[in-house]
Every structure is written in C-alpha cells, then in structure tokens.
UniProtKB/Swiss-Prot annotation:
It holds the Pfam family MENTAL. The keyword Chloroplast does not apply. Residues 225-235 have a biased composition (Basic and acidic residues). This is STARD3 N-terminal-like protein. Tethering protein that creates contact site between the endoplasmic reticulum and late endosomes: localizes to late endosome membranes and contacts the endoplasmic reticulum via interaction with VAPA and VAPB. It comes from Mus musculus.
Amino acid sequence: MNHLPEHMENTLTGSQSSHASLRDIHSINPAQLMARIESYEGREKKGISDVRRTFCLFVTFDLLFVTLLWIIELNVNGGIENTLKKEVIHYDYYSSYFDIFLLAVFRFKVLILGYAVCRLRHWWAIALTTAVTSAFLLAKVILSKLFSQGAFGYVLPIISFILAWIETWFLDFKVLPQEAEEENRLLLVQDASERAALIPAGLSDGQFYSPPESEAGSEEEAEEKQESEKPLLEL
C-alpha cells in the first residue's frame, strides 16, 4: 500500500482537528456562545492569565531561594556581618557568592518587568536571562575557586543554572502556547457567534400547529343535519 508522506498526514490531521473544533463551536446554541465570550472577556479584563501568574510566582521563588541559600552561606562562613563585608565590600570574583545573588536579582527584574508588567508574548526576554545566567555561571565555575569552599561552591551555581532553565521551559512550553490557544478559541467563538446571528431562526413546532375545531362550528353542523332529516320524518 502507498503511504502518504509525513507532512501530508500532519496537514490532514491538523485540518481535521480544526474542522472538528469548528463543528463543536457551531453546534453550541447562542446562549452558550455568549457565555463563553463573556468568560473569555473576563479573563482578558483580569490582565494576566493564570499560567502567566504561576510563571511569575516561580520567578519570585527563584530569587527568594537563591537569597536564602546565600544568607545560609554567609552564616556558615563566620557570621553574616563579617562575611557580608568580605563578599560585598571586598568583592572577589574568584571566591564571592555575591554575584550569583545579583544574577538572581537580574533574572527577577527582567522577567517580572517583561512578562508581568509589559505582558510580553515573545521569548526574547527569557532567552536573554537564560543566556546571561548560563554564560556567567560556566565562566565562574571554570575560573573561580568556589569548589574549594565547601558544599556551597557546588550548590549555588547548580541551583541557579537549573532554575534559569526551568523558567525557560515553563514559559516556552506552557505559558506562551496556552495563551495562544486561548486567544484562538476566543476568535473562533466570536466568529461562530457572528455567523449564528446571521442565520435565521428555525421554524418552531407552534408554526405547524393546527387548532382543533371549535364547538360553535360543530353545533351548527348538527343543527343543519337535524333540519335536513325533518322532512324525511314527516313523510
């Protein structure tokens, strides 16, 4: 048997799914269409989708988690005050963890500004933060002396690297596709509602209803029948 090429099969599958979604939408009555439109408009009025809000919460968790680990590291290495002076005031690229904390602050500011305040629908902001984070951490791991300072020399760079890439995956595979799908659904529902408004309403059963004969008409027929039978009785 001849098999269709893969791209033709994908095209047929996509067209069938789109036709199925259109049939599903057109099969809904106008009241349900209006309810769906109002629900989508309500989501638009909220300003930010649920999945985007979850992404922003994860970005905040990234900053707080790295900050917590850095504070623990300051306590372990001789007290917060003394270690803070050593890592911030007398900053040394080869032995300080302060730059990893600043890297988390950089990710937080760029991502919250881009995807919560400006509500971007593009991946360039997350690509910037992930590229900067990956390049900086790789350079620091290769050039610095963090591994000689105990467990935190491994933990902080690895955690920062993993969190940055989880944010990238979540935005690219969850936030942007889901919001695009919801927008397409809204357009389909609005188009279906506009077409439904142009289609005349179907004929109801009441338009084909024939009322029963009235009692007045039946009484008149009975009187006429009696009058026609009277001459026959007289004979």
